[in-house]
Amino acid sequence: MGMPTTRFTLEFYQSQDGDEPARRWMQKRLSAPQRRALDAALRLILAVHGVGVCGSKYGRHVGRGLFELRLDENEATLVHKSSPASAAPRPARSGDRILLRVFCHAYGERIILLLGGYDKGADP
């Protein structure tokens, strides 16, 4: 079984002054392991399932057209889960705690806007 097929385009919301809150949060507030895990989740989960993540542990509708991507796994676990036919053993959880939320909006049928996010582990 190959890697999942991307069905949705992910775009960062950009304000009138050019700020991209989700991108800024990812680049300035997250540790390297958190960024790698989030990048994997965006590629392997959100870009494949879009708003359909809300039917899984990875998403939840929050109202008014918004939903959140919910992440509590590291990059290695996400990659392993995306290739279940892999002969490799399940990776051990790293010591880095991952508990991230990214707020999203489905724009049209194939675009997901990334609006902002927070580290629930640091800011419960």
Model-inferred region functions:
Residues 101-104:
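Hydrophobic/aromatic beta-strand elements that line small-molecule binding cavities or substrate pockets
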Residues 1-98, 108, 119-124:
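Basic, Lys/Arg-enriched alpha-helical interface segments
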Residues 106-114:
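Active-site beta-strand-loop-beta-strand hairpin of nuclease catalytic cores
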